[in-house]
Amino acid sequence: MNDPKVIVALDYDNLADALAFVDKIDPSTCRLKVGKEMFTLFGPDFVRELHKRGFSVFLDLKFHDIPNTCSKAVKAAAELGVWMVNVHASGGERMMAASREILEPYGKERPLLIGVTVLTSMESADLQGIGILSAPQDHVLRLATLTKNAGLDGVVCSAQEASLLKQHLGREFKLVTPGIRPAGSEQGDQRRIMTPAQAIASGSDYLVIGRPITQAAHPEVVLEEINSSLV
């Protein structure tokens, strides 16, 4: 696959276990997501190990800081050679624009830069608790529009918002969707969920899937089944 749609979320606190899992799967069938826990534990060298094995990496650190600090963190991710990196859209348009501008010298080699809208664990009551009275979907659209205006490549959003965002922001604006569960798997702590085929049909470009793959006895088979369902 030239452009694998599945991004496997790695959530390990043991390096040997993580690499043992990675060695069971084929880099042509998926990409890998490294988040805050693993990056804090194992650092940039872990990402380099994944690159050595041929994997594209989504560095999911959700940077959110003043424009100068955030953009320098994004540049550091580009230097590491990751495929995708993200920032919190709620950091504002100036922060996002600075992060996009700092990637210009990398040309076609630059990572995709993605905004994080509303975390998939958040519901209306959670938003109200931080002073946002809009419905989650309305707030997602507001932040996604801000992200596009800042020149970013797309957003992380739940599959429920995908068709709305494609309609408002265009086909080229990339949608990265967590909360994906293959049919029959546990819901876990993601509140707003959908199957892989449903998510792609709704307009998602990339699907973040964790435990249904990482905890499977035969992850390569699960990946094959998911990819087949997307054809």
From Swiss-Prot:
Any keyword Lyase?
yes
The transmembrane segments are none
Q: Name one GO molecular function term.
A: orotidine-5'-phosphate decarboxylase activity
Residues in a coiled coil are none
Give the top-rank taxon of the lineage listed in the UniProt record for this protein.
Bacteria
Q: In which pathway does it act?
A: Pyrimidine metabolism; UMP biosynthesis via de novo pathway; UMP from orotate: step 2/2
For the keyword rRNA-binding, the answer is: no
Family matches, as SMART domains? OMPdecase
Q: Which reactions is this enzyme annotated as catalysing?
A: orotidine 5'-phosphate + H(+) = UMP + CO2
The record's active-site residues are K62
Quote the record's binding site residues for substrate. 11, 33, 60-69, 120, 181, 190, 210-211
Keywords in UniProt for this one? Answer: Decarboxylase, Lyase, Pyrimidine biosynthesis
Entry GO CC: cytosol
Tell me which EC number(s) this protein carries: 4.1.1.23
Q: Name one GO biological process term.
A: 'de novo' UMP biosynthetic process
Q: What class of enzyme is it?
A: lyase
Which InterPro entries does the UniProt entry name for this protein?
A: Aldolase_TIM, OMPdecase, OMPdecase_AS, OMPdecase_bac, OMPdeCOase_dom, RibuloseP-bd_barrel
Q: One of this protein's Pfam families, by short name? A: OMPdecase
HAMAP family the record matches: OMPdecase_type1_B (MF_01200_B)
Entries under NCBIfam families matching the protein: PRK00230.1 (NF001273), pyrF (TIGR01740)
The protein's role, per its UniProt record: Catalyzes the decarboxylation of orotidine 5'-monophosphate (OMP) to uridine 5'-monophosphate (UMP).
What does the similarity note say?
Answer: Belongs to the OMP decarboxylase family. Type 1 subfamily.
Q: How does it assemble?
A: Homodimer.
Q: What is this protein called?
A: Orotidine 5'-phosphate decarboxylase
Gene name of this polypeptide: pyrF
